[in-house]
Amino acid sequence: MRREVGRLSVVLALSISASLIAGCAAPVARDVRPASAAGGAVVGAAVIEAKPARDWRAGGMVAAANPWAVEAGLEVLRAGGSAVDAAVAVQAVLGLVEPQSSGIGGGAFLVHYDAATGDVVTFDGREVAPQGATPGMFLDDTGKPLTFPVAVRSGRAVGVPGVVSMLGMAHREFGRLPWSRPWQPAIRLAERGFPVSPRLNELIGSALARDALLPAGRAYLTVEGRADGRTPHPVGASLRNPEYARTLRSIATRGARAFYSGGIAEAIVAGAASEPMSGSLSLADLAAYRPARLEPICSGYRVYLVCGMRPPSSGGIAVLSVLGTLENFDMSSMGPATVAGWHHLFEAQRLAYADRDKYVADDRLVAVPLAGLTDKDYLRSRAALVSPSRAMAVVEAGKPPGAPSRGRDATAEVPGTSHFVVVDRMGNVVSMTTTVESLFGSQRFVAGFFLNNQLTDFSFRPVDDRGEAIANAVAPGKKPRSSMSPTLVFRDGAFELAVGSPGGNAIIAYVAKTLVGMLDWGLTPQQAVDLPNVIARGPVVVETARIDPAVVEALKGMGHVFRDGRGEGSGLHAVRVTADGRLQGAADPRREGRAVAVP
């Protein structure tokens, strides 16, 4: 039944607070309606002035990191499924064919646009720290932080997985097919086998070389099929996972809660409790997990409205911070081949990361100055720090309106993860980023899937060197800060594009450069995705194979410090609507994905 909701006319479609609305200078009027809730932790929703469904001529599209996952989504769309139905299918297959990046043992963030009503809502399936978690659980006996390789393999790194419950919540509201239907492609593929891809083969080999697989996962991923296996399954070999099929069949038959009780839950708890460094995750923690349906964070950028995730993801805030800083410069006149264009993008990233590192965490438990961080006047003051000819020598966090005193946290997130976009025949859109965090997560393989190591996204230290409390410190029931940035963009009340990426901390930079490429530099989605990946959080990590060496040398002359990179794990996927109502898709050439349309 369609929800009846009231209307409220404001300057932009949504704001966290009145100060954010007042600060938005984009010359675009929007219509906002508060969206009512239907269970779960609902905060609100943006509502875009919806275009009538009859104006939608684009068919549908799936853009994801693996062809098998794309085909699963297309199968569900052809069967009359919604964007959310297809998202369930895509995620289920990604957990099988790309287990190093995401899966049902991890978490996700999903941004959804309902073309019929104009609702823009987000779903938070982030992992939660168990009740036994402590602020010092990633410190050794001397009080020093554990090294990341030690922490990531520990049971302490495993958070309560959220992706299955989140998909269940989204499906209850936006699913069109029975819950059991979207799981079928993954179940079939797990039972029959799928061909090992070059990327999966390479990453199994890399993990084996670093001795980074625990026995059960090693047995599954190696030719020998033993706990001491040493040979990755070769490219093209058929890999079956009947245990995963049984797990998915249970979820498909009994609903999302089947994952959080009974045999699956017991396997998860046993996996987290195993050595090395057993964790405290319990059956009670799993039973208590609830996803959240939250308002997006949205702001104007030139003639566009950009919407993303709110905390515990820092992605939405940081992407809007980058764009809000760049809005004070004529980026379109600079272009993607200019020194000035990259210089301003670097500086805006540096400013956004400094604020993000200091202030953003799980805002259920920590005060986060959401409105202040994206306030137009504040970002104008940050933009004033940018010189047209010299890189800033030092970048410190600013003092946005409402900011508390915090210690800086430079926690690094490993570039794992996966992102996909689905658009269905009615124009509904899903932009979803999903992860087990590091490659193969915590390396604990249970019930046919890998458990996450998401709790290593917390700061390992509860206070900084000055004794200031760190916002992203560990606490029981808390969600670790994320950089995941599933994003939707609108123009004149109509859906314009969806984009997102994996990449750890660098996700923010990848998404921002792609948005600038399309919105400022006039590039197609594929051209924008293909732009060099650059991450300016400390020394600028630049994808040297894709950027003009002369531009790099000129930027060095301005004071920028560089470190060579190879893309650093991006997997950008985007879909855009053209002026005549057709879909343009993009898949990151750095991975194995594709974007395919349904006529």
Task: Place the predicted regions along the sequence by residue.
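Noncatalytic scaffold domains of N-terminal-nucleophile
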Residues: 28, 32-71, 75, 83-254, ...
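Internal maturation/activation junctions in enzymes
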Residues: 328-435, 444, 565-566
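Extended C-terminal subregions enriched in glycine
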Residues: 426, 477-479, 511, 520-567
